[in-house]
Amino acid sequence: MDNHTKEQRHDNMSHIRSVSKPEVIVRKYLFSQGFRYRKNDKRYAGKPDIVLPKYKTAIFVNGCFWHQHPECSKAVLPKSNTDYWLPKLEKNVLRDKTNIAILKQEGWNVIVIWECMLLKKKREETLKKLKKDIEDNLKLN
């Protein structure tokens, strides 16, 4: 049962935006390194957050809770309204797996960056690895 009226829920949800801080961090880094990309390109399965056509690479910047990052403390199932949350989160995970499989089958390099990997203590290492993975994929193709 929802604790809010329909109007309150609508107002709350209308303030949620698709652009997240982790996504902005990744995009700014890629641009600073000379990569040019497309955002949320609908032509590709799952509408990846970032698409680098030249490198045939699709990047998903996933929130640990929403996409249920395995073994992450941020991916805890809420204690209330579990009848709603469990199926919703399971559906998100299944959709992610399906979209990644489709992209890989089409020959794309798929990189998933988790929100927790962009915290300050891991950010530099994560972004350097991202750059290396993108460049390595170009060499393979």
Name what the model sees in each region.
Residues M1-V112, C116-N141:
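Nucleic-acid endo/exonuclease domains
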